[in-house]
């Protein structure tokens, strides 16, 4: 199976290329916080020579509670993204939830993301595809990896071949997620070699069944990220925060920002090792 590549700015993203770090924060909390987090990621990835794309949401439209913080909104969020690009020269990924958001967001950021909960909404998928932007498709928690081929087909039928697929865990009963390490290879196959990345942060979510916000297992982020990258991926999706306990969204799953350099160094070492191996064809044939 040949690996397809997606070009974002000067970066080439593919399953057989050095992994790209899609990193930042869950939601834009403020302009100053975004600058602080982005600055740290840029410093670490420049030092370690790791390709980097900044990620954050301007609106978390699928929060559990109506009282939860959602973000600054599209207009203010795009202004912050523009400042980050001008200041740090970063490429940016963010998600959209409504059809009207697709074109204006695609004019500012480099990758638009299809949220997991919305990945089968055909009208939204088509609107995103027709922008011509690179699209990152989050695998829904309720969907098998093999079904991702149908979403890819919708995008391709709209004339867009710039597709990245992302796993963020699968429902394991109520209010819990697990990651099937075989799913990455299945997603590569059903997409004919599209880049596949792993959202380790959201895979760590674990809810209180009666609570109004997601819990998490940040103490297991290193082990889970190591395991994912050991399968040979195009990228890792990671959220970090200076003080995860006070983060406005998904703090329990976020990496403490001061641990970022040590974490990324480990991930790079694993990625380098795995991609130094020759690929073995172990399929049984008559």
Swiss-Prot record:
InterPro entries: Aldolase_TIM (IPR013785), DAHP1/KDSA (IPR006218), KDO8P_synthase (IPR006269). The keyword Cytoplasm applies. It catalyses: D-arabinose 5-phosphate + phosphoenolpyruvate + H2O = 3-deoxy-alpha-D-manno-2-octulosonate-8-phosphate + phosphate. GO terms for cellular component: cytoplasm. It holds the Pfam family DAHP_synth_1. GO terms for molecular function: 3-deoxy-8-phosphooctulonate synthase activity. Pathway: Carbohydrate biosynthesis; 3-deoxy-D-manno-octulosonate biosynthesis; 3-deoxy-D-manno-octulosonate from D-ribulose 5-phosphate: step 2/3; Bacterial outer membrane biogenesis; lipopolysaccharide biosynthesis. GO terms for biological process: keto-3-deoxy-D-manno-octulosonic acid biosynthetic process. Its EC number is 2.5.1.55. Keywords: Cytoplasm, Lipopolysaccharide biosynthesis, Transferase. Its main location: cytoplasm. The keyword Hydrolase does not apply. It is found in: Cytoplasm. Belongs to the KdsA family. This is 2-dehydro-3-deoxyphosphooctonate aldolase. It comes from Haemophilus ducreyi (strain 35000HP / ATCC 700724). The lineage of its organism: Bacteria, Pseudomonadati, Pseudomonadota, Gammaproteobacteria, Pasteurellales. The gene is kdsA.
